[in-house]
A protein has these predicted regions:
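Phosphate-group recognition and catalysis centered on beta-loop-alpha active-site segments
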Residues: 1-296
């Protein structure tokens, strides 16, 4: 077998060949280091399911799976009778045109309520119903469950969600977050093996300092908080960043190139296209399948 050492070129110009190889090596290393560190393969996360249905309903969530989402982000709060239901708002005025609060209605009443968005009509699901539907359809897509705390009921909400998840053997398909840091920390204390993040709304100053050392598994931030310095700091602290709500494909690519690990979007089909395109053209090192990561 012919090797470099006995080639004619090397014998005649050893210094030139050595210098050329060194230059190529430096270029390759530079290209590698230029790529931002990404803590796991980038995920497409459908915001409240997707735009293709009434938010947080069966239609929007099942369509998110069909459109290529890795996860559907859903909002979960408690009904009057303590059942986790999937709805974002504290009242029904926007989606059902009713002057009723979620906390004052039973799960049965809520599940019978029609909600509307554009040409779509659907009903409010319970978390239990939704998980059963996903499992029945053998849906690979998981759920990013946001705990919507009302009147300091974070611990009760977390306990109820734990019950539903474990009853349905859905531990490996779900990840969790909340705007309420106390609830995040409580859920961490109860199920430290679960993938639990903090959703930040408003000033990013709230997340500096000791938060990086509190075992947060990921951060979900608004678009305007996804700066180069912030994402780099998060990645250095081994905290993946998911950015919301990004609906423009070119912006999705920009955030992925910045080093974010998840795109939360109303259009999971656009997200799927952007992530697949990004993965074809980039060679990041992925810290994948670390402790606590769900199967995906």
């Amino acid at each position: 077998k012919r090797t470099l050492n006995n080639s004619r070129l090397y014998n005649h110009h050893p210094r030139m060949v050595t210098a050329l190889l060194a230059f190529i090596s430096v270029c390759l290393v530079g290209m590698y280091l230029e790529q931002p560190l990404m803590l796991h393969h980038p995920w497409v996360i459908g915001h409240r399911g997707s735009i293709y249905g009434v938010e947080n309903t069966d239609g929007a969530i099942m369509t998110a799976a069909d459109k290529g989402a890795d996860y559907a982000e859903i909002d979960v709060q408690l009904s009057k009778d303590g059942v986790p239901v999937v709805i974002h708002d504290a009242d029904l005025s926007r989606l059902a045109h009713k002057d009723e609060k979620v906390k004052n209605m039973t799960a049965k009443q809520l599940s019978e309520t029609l909600v509307y968005h554009n040409e779509y009509t659907d009903k409010i699901p319970t978390l239990d119903h939704l998980i059963k539907k996903l499992k029945k359809n053998s849906t690979k897509m998981g759920l990013l469950i946001e705990l919507k705390v009302e009147g300091g009921n974070g611990e009760k909400l977390a306990k109820k969600i734990i019950d539903v998840i474990e009853k349905n053997d859905y531990q490996k398909q779900a990840i969790y977050m909340s705007l309420d840091l106390d609830t995040v920390q409580y859920l961490q204390s109860q199920r430290p093996e679960w993938w639990i993040g903090y959703c930040i709304y408003g000033s990013a100053g709230d997340i500096e300092g000791s938060l990086w050392n509190q075992g947060i598994d990921f951060l979900a931030i608004e678009e305007n908080r996804a700066t180069v310095s912030f994402v780099e700091k998060a990645n250095r602290n081994w905290v993946p960043v998911y950015v919301w709500t990004v609906d423009d494909e070119s912006r999705m690519i920009q955030y992925l190139e910045l080093g974010v690990s998840g795109i939360i979007t109303n259009y999971p089909n656009r997200g799927r296209k952007a992530v697949d395109k990004f993965k074809e053209n980039n060679y990041q090192y992925y810290y994948h399948h670390g402790s606590g990561y769900p199967d995906s």
